[in-house]
Amino acid sequence: MDNQLTTELKERYGIVFHDVNLLEQAFTHSSYVNEHRYLKLSDNERLEFLGDAVLELIVSQYLYLKFPELPEGKLTKMRAAIVREDSLAKFAKECHFDNYILLGKGEEASGGRTRASLLCDLFEAFLGALYLDQKVGAAKKFIEDVIFPKIDAGAFSHEMDHKTQLQEVLQRKGDVSIEYRLIKEEGPAHDRTFFTEVYMNGELIGLGQGKSKKLAEQDAAERALKSIPQ
């Protein structure tokens, strides 16, 4: 196994594998195995299968606890954005995993080292190997270091509704109280328009309207997001 990889994992993430064969397998692409059959190596596809499940469980639990007001559909949409191919490929590159993957000559020549699908699989395979080597706690710690800060910084906030986005932005500024107040209703019963104000610590920060109370609150939150520095 590349000593530089083991050194980087230890220095950046405090990870030291007990079974380095698992680490080597995680970074071994099937194309390399096919070109080096005499070495009797195993590729990373089975580890990828396991890592996919580990990642989904840990991310799901984090989103469930962090966003108690989000419905199932919103949580599912956000999780999908986090674990999709291009996101995981980006995480793999940020971890410098692309520098260490073992590829066959043909795969290397065709640009496999920068291919999103390959890097996504590599990231999941690494998680699978880490889980087998050190159980779920180590895998969770790694994801906490690599992925959770991006969630906290709002990298996937476009997957949330405006009220949740506003809550995230304001909570980063400290302990705040957010309140929505319905101030009036206009129009006939079959075509009402609702007007809502949103307050932060008692200060008005947004005014919205909509054909339901929920839509009026969403509009108020959206307007507040546009008016406050982030």
Curated annotation (Swiss-Prot):
Cofactor dependence: Mg(2+)
S-S bridge residues: none
Subcellular location: Cytoplasm
Residues annotated as binding Mg(2+): 48, 121, 124
Pfam families found in the cross-reference section: dsrm (PF00035), Ribonucleas_3_3 (PF14622)
GO cellular component: cytoplasm
Catalysed reactions listed for this entry: Endonucleolytic cleavage to 5'-phosphomonoester
SUPFAM superfamilies: dsRNA-binding domain-like, RNase III domain-like
Catalytic residues of the enzyme: 52, 124
GO terms (BP aspect): mRNA processing; regulation of gene expression; rRNA processing; tRNA processing
Keyword annotations: Cytoplasm, Endonuclease, Hydrolase, Magnesium, Metal-binding, mRNA processing, Nuclease, RNA-binding, rRNA processing, rRNA-binding, tRNA processing
Domain DRBM: start-end pairs: 161-230
E.C. number: 3.1.26.3
Source species, domain of life: Bacteria
Enzyme class: hydrolase
Main localization (coarse): cytoplasm
Function field: Digests double-stranded RNA. Involved in the processing of primary rRNA transcript to yield the immediate precursors to the large and small rRNAs (23S and 16S). Processes some mRNAs, and tRNAs when they are encoded in the rRNA operon. Processes pre-crRNA and tracrRNA of type II CRISPR loci if present in the organism.
Quaternary context: Homodimer.
Similarity comment text for this entry: Belongs to the ribonuclease III family.
Protein name: Ribonuclease 3
Record lineage: Bacteria, Bacillati, Bacillota, Bacilli, Lactobacillales
